[in-house]
């Protein structure tokens, strides 16, 4: 029997959830409020618009948890990964995309799908119970009326953190007599050559002057949001500078793995990297340079960077507030709201962090909804998989800071990482049986974790097809 499943929100999570529902033969109705109502971060009415970076991060499925997540999503027929692969741009070992082409591909695929209906307009308040099963994937910029409805239903306050956007520079305004193309350690990646980033070097004097300017620069006022924490994975560059004069050169401006071909014997104190932002190669974004500086200060301070003295900005950085649920308290293991099980949540509003993670949670929300509609609930995903580890963190991670009833909540937005995976039962050893140490141990451990994940996902998929739970693979 065909089921109508409503999806509120047409971002990465909502788009992926709708695709999974539609591909399973059910009807997906996407409710997207743009362009009827905009947000402080979105610029278009396209589905799956990327509002921050254009990078999906590492595409390495052997040594990186997000690369493994890419692989798992591809194996489950992810629309988001298909569109990313089709619209990739050079980015070293990362998977980066032409943001406009990517959004257009997702929008086109959903608009043309016979099982998808796209409704433009805001859902004011909670979805009506008459809708039946519904997936709420409204993201970190959930409209006030819906956010208030969620709070009223759950009796819980959503937590919040700031998110900052990095500037984008016109390629032809970058001084190529100063900057050079190189990926860190010359590492190639999907669609790349090993020389995919533009690098702008700084001497010690230039770096110290730049850091001082960041600290002293005029910032956007945000008194109404005081006390709201930042997510460490998206700290504004000036906040990093305020943490200490050496923070940036050991973070986004680290010079390791890069050599200036014009002066190969002199090691820069720091390097600013820019990554291709569109397929034409005409736009580059400043890697790690999310900011809450005022627009005029951004232009002044960022033009202090060697090679960017005459930079023309296609987009300046900005600041917005993100909100997310206390998901371990509010959601069950299949992302249903305990207070109203007909509602599922997906994407960043659940407390995952990152484009790929948001889409991954949307993928699983769609599959959970389809399985429930068919009367064949899915077995829990093995936590040994990237998808399972992410869902387990969202639905079961960190209820209390110290276990006390009145303690503050410690649940925070999280990127997928190997720390979310169950430990291996046996420490990795080499071919001779010797226990390993250092980098060799770390590399082999990651390989063992990814091998286990692939085996366990294959068993889970077989069980899902058979409609029965299967045991996890042996270590």
Curated annotation (Swiss-Prot):
Residues at which FAD binds: 9-14
Cofactor(s), names only, from the UniProt record: FAD
GO biological process, one term: tRNA wobble uridine modification
Domain of life: Bacteria
Subcellular location: Cytoplasm
GO molecular function: flavin adenine dinucleotide binding; tRNA (uracil(54)-C5)-methyltransferase activity, 5,10-methylenetetrahydrofolate-dependent
Reactions the enzyme catalyzes: uridine(54) in tRNA + (6R)-5,10-methylene-5,6,7,8-tetrahydrofolate + NADH + H(+) = 5-methyluridine(54) in tRNA + (6S)-5,6,7,8-tetrahydrofolate + NAD(+); uridine(54) in tRNA + (6R)-5,10-methylene-5,6,7,8-tetrahydrofolate + NADPH + H(+) = 5-methyluridine(54) in tRNA + (6S)-5,6,7,8-tetrahydrofolate + NADP(+)
Annotated Gene3D superfamilies: FAD/NAD(P)-binding domain
Main location, first listed in the record: cytoplasm
Keyword Membrane part of the UniProt annotation: no
Keyword terms: Cytoplasm, FAD, Flavoprotein, Methyltransferase, NAD, NADP, Transferase, tRNA processing
Annotated stretches, region: Disordered: 427-447
GO cellular component, one term: cytosol
E.C. number(s) listed in UniProt: 2.1.1.74
Role noted for this protein: Catalyzes the folate-dependent formation of 5-methyl-uridine at position 54 (M-5-U54) in all tRNAs.
HAMAP family (alphabetical): TrmFO
Family per record: Belongs to the MnmG family. TrmFO subfamily.
Protein name, UniProt field: Methylenetetrahydrofolate--tRNA-(uracil-5-)-methyltransferase TrmFO
Gene: trmFO
